[in-house]
Swiss-Prot record:
Reactions that this protein is recorded to catalyse: Thiol-dependent hydrolysis of ester, thioester, amide, peptide and isopeptide bonds formed by the C-terminal Gly of ubiquitin (a 76-residue protein attached to proteins as an intracellular targeting signal)
Organism of derivation: Xenopus laevis (African clawed frog)
Function: Deubiquitinating enzyme that may function as negative regulator of the innate immune system. Has peptidase activity towards 'Lys-48'- and 'Lys-63'-linked polyubiquitin chains. Can also cleave 'Lys-11'-linked ubiquitin chains (in vitro).
Keywords per UniProt: Hydrolase, Protease, Thiol protease, Ubl conjugation pathway
Region (Cys-loop): 176-182
Name of the molecule in the record: OTU domain-containing protein 5-B
Length: 518
């Protein structure tokens, strides 16, 4: 069963009793079936009354009892920004009675009346459209003050307000876009963390007002459906009625700050809890901004999420981001290590291939050198053999003793020259077996040179040294009386070989001095 609110007596029956009717016909005495009890109706803003508007009276007035809002500051404050009006009505002027001021918080329009001269003047006054479209009467006085405020003074006041909130409370004012939806943007910023979700907040608020129309309609003088349809527009300003609805909807108190460190008004929800309130700041009596506490997370509080902890999502996201970053970094490092290992292997392969190529080229050069050297050696041996044959005729007339004494002076020179010119290290590495001194014939030397075509640099130093030593030794050391003809041939061959060695050394020095083009 629904208990309807009490009807108010017509204005004509008690023209000066609006103040009394405000207390006797308070809307908080109205109750609804199945609804939760309300501690107070939507509060109205406290402001010093204007003498010109104190005598005004609006028809069909419904005023909440005074003192229903928690006020924490002094000074004039408007409850909303101007909004478009969808209905109009005529008002009559009454020069007496301060209680005739229409102070209801839900008035969607207001007609300012011009009083005639004299405090007791009465009569009909023409209506003006100066205040048309405002949500309540307390916007008129503050709006007039704002228009005459110096811009520099207003800027200093805004700066002081932000600095005071930051130093004393640690709060930060977040600027909202000034497009008529600033109140819903401020609430969306603190509930959803994104002011662009103001349309969702507005839709939920209007739906909540429609579901509780039997309560909130008592504070709206115009048709409640028309009021809701107008408030659904994105460019329509919000008011304290919407603040009360959002405080109940999100079950979070709504605190309003205006140029002070303490809230001038607080809207409470149905149930008291320890949730962080929704804080908004009111600027120039026309704009709302969001006031946030950077040290305490409040996003998501009031949405009815089970087991929701403010800030836990950010921590989880941070941990997930750190874990993902570490995994990505580890994978990147492993990939780089593999790339470096691959480069190292490829480098080793390239080095090995280059070394093998250079070694092969060096081997080819050595083969070419070895192929050219046998021809030079055979030519030298043939010239040495011819010289030896011509020298045999001269030595044939001599006795062995004379030949030995004649040939002996030459041997020290050979031995000394051999000692002065030692063999090169490269030739020592390729030494073969020295030829036997017992068979020193020219034919044997030629055949031996032909057989060693692949290795022509056979060192003859051991054989020459042996022959030189044998020339200095006495024949009696070997059990002989005198040297035979073989000894003469051996000495001739030794001289030929010495000549060949000198030629080879000169050619080697010539090749070393000139660049190797092969």
């Amino acid at each position: 069963m629904t208990i309807l609110p009490k009807k108010k007596p017509p204005p004509s029956s008690d023209p000066e009793g609006n103040g009394e009717r405000s207390g006797s016909g308070a809307p908080d005495s109205h109750s609804r079936s199945g609804a939760r009890p309300r501690s107070s109706p939507p509060p109205r803003w406290a402001y010093p009354g204007n003498p010109s508007s104190a005598a005004e009276r609006h028809t069909q007035q419904v005023s909440p009892p005074p003192g229903s809002a928690t006020s924490g500051g002094a000074g004039p404050l408007g409850d909303g920004a101007p909004a478009s009006s969808s209905s109009s009505s005529s008002s009559s002027c009454n020069g007496a009675g301060a209680g005739g001021c229409c102070s209801g918080p839900g008035h969607s329009k207001r007609r300012r009346q011009v009083l005639s001269a004299g405090p007791g003047a009465t009569g009909n006054c023409p209506d003006t459209d100066d205040g048309a479209g405002n949500n309540s009467e307390d916007e008129y006085e503050t709006a007039a003050q704002t228009q005459h405020l110096d811009p520099d003074t207003a800027q200093q006041q805004e700066h002081w307000f932000e600095k005071a909130l930051c130093e004393k409370k640690g709060f930060i004012i977040k600027q909202m876009k000034e497009d008529g939806a600033c109140l819903f943007r401020a609430v969306a910023d603190q509930v959803y963390g994104d002011q662009d979700m103001h349309e969702v907040v507005r839709k939920h608020c209007m739906d909540y007002l429609m579901k509780n129309a039997d309560y909130f309609s008592n504070y709206v003088t115009e048709d409640f459906t028309t009021y809701i349809n107008r408030k659904r527009k994105n460019n329509c300003h919000g008011n304290h009625i919407e603040m009360q609805a959002m405080a109940e909807m999100y079950n979070r108190p709504v605190e309003v700050y205006q140029y002070g460190t303490e809230p001038i008004n607080t809207f409470h929800g149905i149930q008291q809890n320890e949730d962080e309130p929704i804080r908004v700041s009111y600027h120039r009596n026309i704009h709302y901004n969001s006031v946030v506490n950077p040290n305490k997370a409040t996003i998501g509080v009031g949405l009815g999420l089970p087991s929701f902890k403010p800030g836990h999502a950010e921590q989880s996201l941070m941990k997930s981001a750190i874990r993902t970053s570490e995994e990505s970094w580890i994978e990147q490092q492993m990939l780089e290590d593999k790339k470096r290992a691959t480069d190292w292997e490829a480098t080793n392969e390239a080095i090995e291939e280059q070394v093998a190529r250079e070694s092969y080229l060096q081997w080819l050069r050595d083969q070419e050198k070895q192929a050219r050297q046998p021809r030079k050696a055979s030519a030298t041996c043939s010239s040495a053999t011819a010289a030896a044959c011509s020298g045999l005729e001269e030595w044939s007339g001599r006795s062995p003793r004379q030949r030995s004494t004649a040939g002996s002076p030459e041997q020290p020179d050979v031995h000394a020259e051999l000692c002065m010119k030692p063999p090169s290290p490269g030739a020592a590495l390729t030494l073969g077996k020295p030829p036997s001194p017992c068979a020193p014939g020219p034919s044997n030397q030629m055949s031996a040179g032909a057989d060693r075509a692949t290795s022509p640099l056979v060192s003859l130093y051991p054989a020459l040294e042996c022959r030189a030593i044998m020339q200095h030794m006495s024949p009696t050391a070997f059990g002989l009386k005198d040297w035979d003809d073989d000894e003469i041939l051996a000495s001739v061959l030794a001289a030929s070989q010495q000549e060949y060695l000198d030629t080879m050394k000169k050619s080697t020095l010539r090749r070393e001095s000139s660049p190797d083009h092969s």
